[in-house]
């Protein structure tokens, strides 16, 4: 008999789930979490709990928590680890923030949704004790360069096509579980947060004269799957670079925007009164392409801009790529044809949501339609 009850009404969550936890006392059996997991993400109902050894399948996307109106299903908090790091005088705390946070945090303090509050966000992190605050957009630029370069290399050398983006850990987990045959098609590029964390414990540490053993790298972002990503065994590039396993994982702690808001409230900071501050330099600069990462289709658009430059040697003209309307918007599946100069034409697609991804990939198996790049 399964230890998970009422799975016809709610999502089963393992006690050791690194991203999501479930307070059953708050659960009203409203089925919203279940519908999000089964109907929107196509995870629940797409495996047999008994056949899987009574171990729930989870891609850590957090859609169940987003759907729960009672705070029964929520992200696993790591604020205690953050506070412990800040209280340790031996530690240097470096916090990176994803682009979405600066326009989402205001809702927790009475601002209109979408209000741009980068300065206050950085100022709040400094007031909370961060030694350095850096912008994940720098890591996004690294992702763009690697992903676009890899795509061009595959096209030139006859590599596995289509190339899928790989910077979303929930999508990577989804592919590992349900479409393992497509793993060779995934880009080797890590998420922008993971790449920047590795840079913090290597390049940043060297330039600032900091022992990487003393760095605690923290990420603030809207994604619960990033919590699980920090614990994947391959997420230790800095330790491998230094040939020293004691450096640990690249990202030590990942907290969500909601956790960040709660942290500010717990410390009784007056967010409205916080003075604006700026990101630290060195890895605090970014291009405009990195900022659109937070949009559905943004990774595709940014990668196409860079691929154009790699293929032609020139910046794309304004009419060519800077307004890729076809891959923007909230439709579940979007397709476009991209011209990279005179000689290269790419078929691309943007898919969001697990159910849309499952349907798209199953259709792709059947119809064999050609794509070069898929986000």
Residue ranges and their predicted role:
Residues 4-6, 10, 19-22, 26-52, ...:
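Iron-sulfur cluster-binding cysteine motifs and their immediate structural context
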Residues 75-375:
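Iron-sulfur-associated redox domains of electron-transfer enzymes in respiratory
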Residues 48-60, 116-121, 173:
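Short low-complexity stretches enriched in small and charged residues
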Residues 46-54, 181-187:
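Short helix/strand-bridging catalytic loops that position acidic/His residues to coordinate divalent metals
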């Amino acid at each position: 008999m399964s230890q998970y009850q009422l799975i016809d009404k709610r999502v089963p969550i393992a006690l050791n789930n690194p991203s999501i936890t479930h307070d059953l006392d708050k659960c009203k059996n409203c089925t919203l979490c279940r519908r999000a997991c089964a109907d929107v993400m196509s995870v629940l109902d797409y495996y047999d709990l008994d056949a899987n050894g009574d171990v729930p399948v989870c891609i850590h996307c957090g859609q169940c928590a987003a759907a729960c109106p009672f705070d029964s299903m929520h992200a696993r908090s790591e604020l205690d680890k953050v506070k412990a790091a800040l209280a340790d005088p031996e530690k240097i705390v470096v916090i990176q923030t994803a682009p979405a946070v600066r326009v989402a945090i205001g809702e927790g303090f009475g601002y209109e949704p979408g209000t741009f509050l980068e300065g206050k966000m950085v100022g709040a992190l400094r007031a909370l004790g961060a030694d350095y605050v850096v912008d994940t957009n720098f890591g996004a630029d690294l992702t763009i360069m690697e992903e676009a370069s890899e795509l061009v290399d595959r096209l030139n050398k006859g590599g596995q096509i289509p190339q899928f983006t790989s910077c979303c850990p929930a999508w990577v987990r989804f592919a590992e579980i349900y479409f393992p045959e497509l793993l060779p098609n995934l880009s080797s590029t890590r998420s922008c947060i993971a790449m920047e964390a590795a840079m913090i414990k290597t390049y940043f540490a060297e330039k600032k004269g900091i022992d990487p053993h003393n760095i605690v790298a923290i990420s603030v972002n809207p994604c619960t799957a990033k919590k699980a990503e920090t614990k994947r065994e391959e997420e230790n590039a800095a330790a491998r670079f230094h040939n020293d396993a004691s450096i640990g994982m690249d990202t030590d702690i990942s907290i969500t925007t909601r956790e960040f808001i709660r942290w500010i409230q717990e410390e009784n900071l007056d967010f409205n009164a916080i003075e604006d501050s700026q990101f630290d330099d060195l890895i605090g600069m970014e291009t405009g392409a990195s900022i659109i990462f937070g949009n559905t289709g943004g990774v595709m658009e940014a990668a196409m801009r860079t691929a154009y430059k790699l293929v032609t040697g020139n910046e794309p003209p304004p009419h060519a790529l800077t307004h890729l309307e076809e891959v923007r918007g909230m439709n579940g599946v979007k397709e476009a044809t991209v011209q990279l100069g005179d000689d290269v034409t790419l078929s691309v697609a943007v898919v969001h949501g697990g159910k849309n991804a499952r349907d798209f990939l199953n259709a792709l198996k059947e119809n064999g339609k050609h794509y070069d790049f898929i986000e």
